[in-house]
């Protein structure tokens, strides 16, 4: 008896949900206006920046390539560790590191790096595809999808299908040398200086 009542209630709830979705009262899954997708959209638009002509005595401006992949079925936190691993490496060294990493995100990041390397040669006038290094590499939260997780006794919960975005910036030239890590005293001194250099809005 209790099982039949639970089944009828569950069926009624599903009918109400379908009716609301069809009538437009609930937001559709294709509509997404968060700042996360806005950032991923603006990232590749940086490739369209046109700089003014340089003077003959100025050093040549290195080429910059912005590339990303959106809605990767992977956790942004797991992707962050891999993104931090290759930051500051040459592109060949980064691809070699990801080649021998057995994580799922490493294979995806390797594909993104190869795509960015190909874009640099085809669209950004880079002569040698190996003459690039990873200037920026980070992950960000994607659009999560909510789904029903079924429990016992006719109950249910809401779970998230996790997605992430991955962003990379390649710059032409050799990688910059790594800086010496700051000591605790230097970090504290820099922090105090930042506090002292603050400005009060609408102040004298």
Swiss-Prot record:
Annotated GO MF terms: structural constituent of ribosome
A Pfam family annotated for this UniProt entry: Ribosomal_L22
Similarity remark: Belongs to the universal ribosomal protein uL22 family.
Signal peptide region: none
Principal location listed in the UniProt entry: mitochondrion
Species assigned in the record: Xenopus tropicalis (Western clawed frog)
Encoding gene (name): mrpl22
Superkingdom of origin organism: Eukaryota
Transit peptide: 1-27
InterPro entries: Ribosomal_uL22, Ribosomal_uL22_bac/org-type, Ribosomal_uL22_sf
SUBUNIT field: Component of the mitochondrial ribosome large subunit (39S) which comprises a 16S rRNA and about 50 distinct proteins.
One GO biological process term: translation
Keywords: Mitochondrion, Ribonucleoprotein, Ribosomal protein, Transit peptide
GO cellular component: mitochondrial large ribosomal subunit; mitochondrion
Full protein name: Large ribosomal subunit protein uL22m
